[in-house]
Structures are given as structure tokens and as C-alpha cells.
Amino acid sequence: DTGADHHAGCVHFEPLVGESGLGSLLGSGITARESGYDFRLAHALRSVPRRAGEATPATATVREPRSAPGKISLRAMTHLLWQQAGIDRWVPAMQGKRNWGVLRYRLSECARLNHPNTAPLADILLMAKPFKESEAAGHAAARATFLASCTQPDRDGVSRKVIVLGELKSATPVDSGDVRVLLKHMSEQPFLADQKIWKRVQKVYRPLLKAKAVDDMLRLVVTAIVSAQTERVYRIDALSLILTTENWIPVESAAEAELIRALVAAGRSFYKPLAFASNPAMFPGAVLRDSGPKRFNLEVISAFEDEKTGKLRMASIKDRGSKWIWTLGEAMPPLPPRIVPPRSPQPVVG
């Protein structure tokens, strides 16, 4: 693969593996194949019946801060799909064209190439088709059939779990004591999270939830592993959230969202390095692809970061030698001029 050697504005350009969190997982949690990836999730994808007298397993987990060696989190899997599908990138021609239907198609194509825990991801991944009134009943019936067929126990009582991915619509307490989680385009099918797991969600993802609470244009994308409790009652066993802009570009904070929106408004071409399992402070806020043959890092700093994160970010910026740094609250520095690449760009070595 020579994509990283191409002119940054070339259609064949690909970021270096080490420019995102994928680099730290290749060979340890993710194995690259010719046309996709194999990986092991840190969560089981099968439910095994308990023997008589066996203790009830611990409550579901939101996400593991540090996955076991050789395994990856749901967040890392979601970032992998986003990067494979090219949703971490932006060019002005995408304006107004990147909707849930396009996103779902690209993610579905990537799911066919990946194998979590040796199973084809496409066989257990549920993403709702875009809502259309005339087709809503048929789509809902198809989802119900898919969930039932995937989670039906076999002769030994072992049943598969399903990975559900979609934009969060609402999360509300219900009389059972659970929290009912609804996803857009499939609100007829609730997924239940017990209060303990949802309190953990609120703790782990508090910055993302707060960012969404004050900016309705941002999106929260849920990736969850669900299992059948009874007929049509599906419980969340593990859950991860990522925050994205209205154009589905992942961001780690409101500060990054401001940078991404400024770039989109300026008509720039760029990509957003995704953290996977790494600390997001290790990566630039965005990387321009239209300012010359080389990548151009854009850094954004917020005064509201904790001291540890701030020190890591500043050390990473120094290591990269970045020249463009925007401190929020101050005027954004001028962006480097846009440079149109040659019609037949040559590989750039070094």
C-alpha cells in the first residue's frame, strides 16, 4: 500500500498507519488481511446459559478503559469502521451529501470485510435503514426477524449477541427501573440498559453528553452489544459512544467540533485522526490535505482540559513540530493557502 506516499490532495492518498490509533493496535488487537481486518472484542458475542446454582454474572460494562491484551474495545471497533469507510475525511464536494443512508452503506460494505471474534461482522451487525414512511413497517419487521434469528438459543442454550450501531435518539427511565435507549430510524425497537450501566455511561461519557446537550447539531453514535432477555426484550450488555459533527466526523470535544466546522465552512479538504484505544490528546485536531504535497497538522487547545491531558497534548504537539495552533477563545490563526494538486500527482517519498 503506497497511499501514504501520494500527494496529500491525491484521491489515492491514505494517512500513515501511525497517524491514528490504529497503529498501536495492529499486530496486538487487530490483524490486517488483504481486504479487511480480524480482531477480538473485549466482550463476548455469545450468551452461555448458567448452570443451576451459578451466580448471576456482573452487570454489563460500558467500555473497558484498558482492554485485555489482544482485544479491542467497541470504541476502537467503531473508529476502525469509520476510518475504513473514509468517514474520517472531508472534501467540499461532500457538502450536503453525507447522510445516514450514505453512511450506512459505507459501513455495511466495511462490515463485510471484518471478522470480530472469528465471526463475520456483517452477520451480527444491525444498522437501521433510513426511515421512510412507506417502508417503515417492512423495515421494522425485517429488524425484528434479524434480532430474533441472531439471538435464538441453539440446542445447548447458547445464543449469539448482536452489535447495534446507530445515532442516539433518546434515553429515558422506565417503570421497570431500566433506561430505554432508542436509536434514530428504528425507534420501534427499544434496548434496555439497567440503571447501573447507564450511570456508568453518564460518568464515562459526561464530556460528550454535555457537549451534545448544548449543541443539538452534534450527534452521539451508539455502538452496543445486545442480547435477548425474552421475546422482543433486548438488553444492552456493553456500550460505547462517539461524538460526531453534523457531517458524522468524529470529535472528542466541543473544541474539536469548532475546528472541524471552521474547516468545512472554509471549503477545506482534511482528515480527522481517530484515537481508537489511544489518548486523543496524542493526535492533531485535524490534518489538511489541500495545502501542498505534505500533510499539515492543525492543533486546537482548550483551557478547560485537565492538567494531565493538557501536558500530553503539548508534548505531542512539540513532537510533531506543528506550527498551526489555535487556542480557543482567541482568534483562529489564518489557515495555510489552498494549493490545487497536479492533475497527475506523483508519489512523494520521505
Explain the meaning of each model-derived region.
Residues D1-G350:
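Intrinsically disordered, low-complexity linker/tail regions enriched in polar/charged residues
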